[in-house]
Structures are given as structure tokens and as C-alpha cells.
Design a protein with these regions (language model features):
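Acidic, metal/ion-coordinating pockets
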Residues: 1-170
Length: 170
């Protein structure tokens, strides 16, 4: 982690405590990231509290929360993920982007806010593995306006660890 910091590359995941210092802000957009995979779990209540505090300190910022969470190779989010996502939105997040399961999971709208549970894989050396779904992922394009959020999905596929766009974007 020290090497990444010296190279000015942000990272999350700490074996003992939540990374409370991973906040990036620029041009009215705030970004928080948390790890929810063993053994680097940040407790749900701490995540919700950090989100709440961040939103209170930056009420006009569009707050994006990224979560490394979920169960690998599961095509649907778990009840625990859904409960945490709702807590995070209730605490003030404007958008949640998740990853870790290595497959794309559903998108939910909760109280007018979007939750991308898992974007699947983008660049990952899974060419020799058993599920074709691990060779697929999503890139999310965002346009953030004061009154609305516009997004586009760009499906990607990977071959020999090289991502490329699929034919259709949504």
C-alpha cells in the first residue's frame, strides 16, 4: 500500500480497519471506496457513517461509492449486499458501483439512485477459466448534471486479457 501511495495511486483494503482516508474530490464529485471482502471487511455501520459524514460535509457534491464486495461467480447480488446498498443510499450516496464477483450483476434503482452491484471483469486473466461470463463486463459512462444523472452502458468482452467493446451499447 505504501508503494501505491508513493506512486499517487489510490487503493482500499486494510486488514484491521476501514480506510477512512480514501476520499477523492474534484469538480463537485466526491468518490469513496470500500472493501467488503474477507479479510479486509469494513463494517457496514462504519461505511454508512463515513458516507453520512462525507455527504454532510459536502452536501452539494455528487457522492459516488465504490464497493469491492459480493460473492464470486454469483449472477445476482446477495441480500447482505442489497441491505448495505440501501443503507449507503439512505446515508447520502448518489450512486453505487460494485465489483468483485467477476460476473455482471443487476442494476437497481433505489429511491431514485442507481446501484450497479457488479460490473464484471474488465481486464483480467480469465481466458482459461470455466465461465464465459467471466470474459464479459460493463463500462459505465456517466454524465452528471445538477438535476439528473445520465448513464450509458458499454458491454466489453476480454480475449487474452485484452478488453474490447461488444457490438451494442445501451
Amino acid at each position: 500500500k505504501e508503494f501505491l501511495k508513493k506512486a499517487n495511486i489510490g487503493s482500499v483494503g486494510h486488514p484491521v480497519e476501514c480506510d477512512k482516508d480514501f476520499l477523492s474530490k474534484e469538480d463537485g464529485i466526491a468518490f469513496l471506496a470500500f472493501n467488503k471482502t474477507f479479510p479486509f471487511n469494513c463494517p457496514d455501520n462504519e461505511i454508512a457513517e463515513i458516507v453520512k459524514t462525507t455527504k454532510a460535509e459536502n452536501p452539494d457534491d455528487f457522492l459516488i461509492v465504490m464497493l469491492h464486495w459480493g460473492v464470486e461467480y454469483q449472477f445476482h447480488s446477495s441480500l447482505a449486499q442489497q441491505n448495505l446498498a440501501h443503507q449507503i443510499i439512505d446515508a447520502g450516496a448518489d450512486l453505487i458501483i460494485g465489483h468483485h464477483p467477476h460476473v455482471v450483476q443487476e442494476i437497481e434503482e433505489y429511491k431514485g439512485k442507481l446501484i450497479f452491484y457488479s460490473l464484471g471483469n474488465f481486464i483480467f486473466d480469465y481466458d482459461r477459466y470455466f465461465l464465459k461470463e467471466t470474459l464479459q463486463g460493463l463500462v459505465v459512462g456517466l454524465e452528471i448534471y445538477p438535476e439528473k444523472l445520465v448513464y450509458r452502458l458499454f458491454p466489453v468482452k476480454t480475449h487474452l486479457s485484452q478488453p474490447s467493446l461488444m457490438e451494442h451499447n445501451y
